[in-house]
């Protein structure tokens, strides 16, 4: 099993360490910048690049949503097994936080009824059903069986959709005015198919997907750059992707949109 050393070092230090370790470690190094940080200067661009997506989304769901006298219906697009391991902080930056996850799950279950949609998985006991969010007849199939969602959540799924604008239309179609949509998707990330990898989105791109079908009340929009300097090289068990022609990748930006649907146009 390979081990990793992440260091902020000079080239001469790197060569010395490499020799001393006798290649037992793969060294992920950054000659000039510390892991997790980067040098930035003032920019004329007005986007927010200080989002911590899972923390900020939890804050919105658990603290900022209006208090109601009923549990809210929460639909996850691309749910997999429905464990929401990143949102609930079971895994954060590759580190397991079991205690946090259990607390977050307990809080989640007091506030929400969970429903999941996945193209490869279903489990009636967890309210997870087969479905293609890009299907032209999705609305008809959905509304005949499931409640109108109060929240629609999708974590790093839209880049894998061949027709993400159809997904946006279907989300608006099954929702009501006031439904919260929470979308995260990569702006800059290496190629990773699951089963395919089609798109990257700017913060404005996520808004544009929905703008033809509804107006949005924007609550959070911008980028999570906390993983910007992490090098997902691959080639080890549990790696993000296998090694490919890109080699190292050090520009991991994720676009985030939290908004409420207003003035449906259909």
What are these regions (language model features)?
Residues 54-63, 99-101, 114, 243:
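Short alpha-helical segments and helix-capping/turn motifs at coil-helix boundaries
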Residues 63-67, 105-107, 247-249:
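A general structural signal for short secondary-structure junctions and capping/turn motifs
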Residues 22, 26, 162-176, 180-266:
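S-adenosyl-L-methionine-dependent methyltransferase catalytic module, highlighting the catalytic core
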Residues 15-69:
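Class I SAM-dependent methyltransferase Rossmann-like catalytic core
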Residues 43-54, 157-160, 164, 199, ...:
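Aromatic-acidic/polar surface patches that form glycan- and anion
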